[in-house]
Amino acid sequence: MNLENVLCQINAYHCILHLPSFRAVVSSNDHSGTLRCRAGRTATTPSPFDRAFLFGEGIYEVCLLVNGRFVDMDSHLARLDRSLAACGMTPPPERPQLERIINDLARRNGVTNGLAYLQVTPGATPRSFTAVPQDRATLFILTQAQDFLSAPHLSRGITVQVRPDIRWLHRDIKTIMLLPQVMAKRSALANGFDDTIFVDEQGITEGSSSNIFIVTDAGTLVTRPLSDHLLAGCTRQRIITLARDAGMTVEERIITRDELSRAPEVFATSATYLVVPITRIDDHVVGDGGIGTVTRRLQDAYIAFIRALAATGAP
């Protein structure tokens, strides 16, 4: 099934797809679903009254692509569904159809290593907090080429600052409202760090775009339990599964600020970070300043998992 045919089957969405030399859009005004493509320009754009523009209302996902295979796509799309349901937003196309669109877009763009970004927004309304969208929702997808498995930070590690978590209290919803995260990352760079770890009144919540793990002196892997205080990371869950399969002890509990400072190993996980060692926290060097034994073991296990998946080739 080619991309044009897939798009024409979707009646509830604009499908805005970033391609190398043009953007393809199914026009909301053309109910026949005709695909309009114009080199170097956009045939139809989302309305400036889309609630994503006016209120930051929308949900997104980022999925890693290696050798034409998306990693844990089922988990990412399941989380997308949960986030949309939590916000009362229109669900995306049926899972098999959405997967075909994403895979076809990656092929058309010639992207075999990189990521796919999906964003769902409610559509256009008058500027009112309570207005109910009457137009189609907007589904935006792009692919981006990048070799995340060769990223220097995988061996070099990253440095982080710790800052109060000022975000809202439904961090389990993967919303496009990312201003606190943007501010945290900019603050980190301005202060000579790579990233930020957030802390609330209980302890460590998560990184600005990652989940956080520590390794205790006894070799136990610890990460904060899932709640509305943090995102249910797909890579986080994969690492927990790989660790337990390898016979490691894993605890999901609160990590205090003091425990974070004393941990011999700390690392972050995300779709694009993979498993990245944290070598310095504020002015404190973690362990010997390099990648720890447990961190290396889990990083190797995760990359091996990805490579085994990628060896099967594009679907």
Regions found by a protein language model. Give the residues of each.
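Short terminal hydrophobic/aromatic SLiMs and anchors at protein ends
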Residues: 14-15, 31
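Compositionally biased, low-complexity intrinsically disordered regions
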Residues: 1, 5, 20-21
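Helix-start/capping segments and mature chain N-termini
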Residues: 26-104, 121, 130-315
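Ordered, amphipathic secondary-structure segments that act as subunit-interaction surfaces
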Residues: 111-120
